[in-house]
Amino acid sequence: MTTSLSNASQGASSTQRVVVRRPVLALAMLSVVATVAGAAPLKEGGRALGARIAPPPSQLVVRFRDEQSRGERVAMTVPRVDRLSKTGGTHLLYRRPMVELAHVFRFAEPATQAEAETVATRLRRDPAIADVEIDDYLFPLFEPTDSSYADATIERMWHLKAPTALRAGGANLPAVWDLTRGSGAVVAVIDSGIFNHDDLEPNILRGHDFISSDSTANGGGFLVANDGDGRDTDPSDPGDWITAEDKAKTIFATCDIANSSWHGTHVAGTVAAVGNNGTGTVGVAFESKVLAVRALGKCFGYGSDISDAIWWAAGAVQPATSQATGLPTNPNPAKVINLSLGSTSGSCATSRQNAIDAARAAGAVVVVATGNDGQVTINSPANCRGVIAVTAHTVEGDNASYANVGPGTAISAPGGGNCTVAALNCLPQGSAGAAGTIYRLVFSTSSDGMREPGTGRPVFLGKVGTSMAAPHVSGVAALLFARMPTLKPDTAKGILTASARPFPSGTYCAGHSDGRCGAGMLDAKRALDRLAELTPAVTAAGPAPIVRIGSTVDLTATATPKPGGLQTLTYRWQQVSGPAVTLTNDTTLQPRFTAPTPGGALSFRFTASDADGFAASSVVNLRANGLPSIATLTPPTATTGGPVFFRVSGTDPDGDPVSYAATGVPSGATFNGTTGEFAWMNATPAGLYTVSITPSDGFETGAVSTVTVTVNDPPRGGGSMDLVGLALLGLW
């Protein structure tokens, strides 16, 4: 059969006709209008984006009142550190003195911002402490240093920036990057494969090449694959050029002569080109990972290959199926699958729908380009159930002249190109406008090679198409999943559409209220705000920072659903770390456990979630602790002027190291708080000396033990002379 396949990226050759085996899916393909092989360094004076993402607090700065009043530093002793830990309710480790009269203490265990604030508040109540502050993090204030992002004279990165009156089509990413950059999220780009590009490679997970051998009817061999073999573990893009010689072959007879597109590399760069590396471009979710999956070859890809690729990319292939098909297990299942491809063959193929259903059941959203035919109908698989179908708009926010719209379209995203509405007087590419040189393309990673990878070098190119629009949506979906991995696919789609920005007045889509263009224009900031609005509010706490081993411990939590979200929440407690305990009532707000013996640091996570996948967690950190004790001491006795030695022997039921603090130590005597050694080299004067010793395990102090040191005068004669005196008198 023969079908017409349109690229979802638009250019000088915007439509290809291909011969297919089953439904054949072609690139929603490209036009290269600008090439940048290098870029100037970022100039100074960029606009700051505000606070950066800070790690959890790890240190406190403490000022002691005695040091402040004396104006001189006081030695930091073990008892003083122990007291600080006890007062703060957590184990603190002494780090170092500061240049000023202050000291840095480190949390022995990770703490949240709220927990650090609690510790600081407790310490501030101690009369011995003048002040406490959480040691914060300072960052340079920057826009991404990638040179094309920073060049405002030619706004190549308009599609990522906040919308303005003159450039209304931006996806509004800068404010979102203060919240998340996609770390932890995986986006599968099922496309032409990947070219090794410096501005992309660090974020690439190499997946699989799904392109099968050609059918005998099409000449057999690997003409479409163009890599000399069939399916394998190398998703590299070998190039997809078409020559006049290729067109002489039946399989490529309806294809247009063209250079290699490097389509998958451009799409992947829009999702996750490396950010803040001082060169090139930046991706929507530039700390996410792209799972490169190759399913499009020269001119097109086979529908059956693409369906398999969807299953595999989502991690939905069962082990038995993997064994049967020879497919390896996917170690990096994607939460987002991008399909910048399409077919005009009509309805959604059953194999594609089944693959999409399986991917969604595995928790992935499937984002698909609507096509580039300029029609009020969308291509397949954009018309499959459950996908996020993406049309494209221009820098002005008008529907792009090539972009398909119609029933099933979910949202519009930056795709570049020319306006549909002539009355908008959209300036052509490269012309001088009020805001600088007009750039009508989507700028991303590519190659300038015309054929094989070895014929070109990594560059940055502009392309237009719904192929370019779809990865913007995939990138923002990755940001949502990075922020909340538990989201359901329909929930993620609902957030994206509910938060979409209205089309500007006078544009094609603003003039059609039938929903043909979807909910509006992609807005990353509004999407993340919507996520926060629907996330439950939770708290969790323990009875005290330190609990006694063997005691019954009750944890408590609160969970409040947000207006507009589901009002029924499910609760779950999990032990995160520490000696294993048995949690009872772990699906309620008040679980219970018995503190283990021996004890140790314990961490528990409380999560409240709803059926849509909105979830919030709070962690409780506490310590099960047994009190240290001191073995019974034998009271030492000495003669005036003689030495006195004894050593304290302490034990701790948790195996924590025991230190000691002593009071009543006589003048001239020493007590080592680490070893427990008492030494008095010249015990004088005679008398009884009571020394009180308190053991500490660094968290709590045990019972005080006392020992009485007896110092006696030398024995005297009582009416008779001693032997020395008698000898001196010659009487002995």
Regions found by a protein language model. Give the residues of each.
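A cross-kingdom C-terminal cell-surface attachment/processing module
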Residues: 722-732
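Solvent-exposed loop segments of extracellular immunoglobulin-like
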Residues: 565-572, 654-660
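Primarily auto-inhibitory N-terminal propeptides
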Residues: 38-159, 175-177
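C-terminal subdomain of the subtilisin-like protease fold in secreted/lumenal serine endopeptidases
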Residues: 311-315, 320-341, 347-355, 362, ...
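Extracellular S/T/G-rich loop segment that most often corresponds to the catalytic His/Ser-adjacent loop
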Residues: 213, 364, 379-482, 486, ...
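Surface-exposed, flexible coil segments in extracellular/virion-facing regions
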Residues: 574-593, 665-667, 671-677
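Protease zymogen maturation seam
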Residues: 42-43, 98-100, 124-186, 194-203, ...
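Subtilisin-like peptidase catalytic core
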Residues: 185, 192, 204-206, 210-347, ...
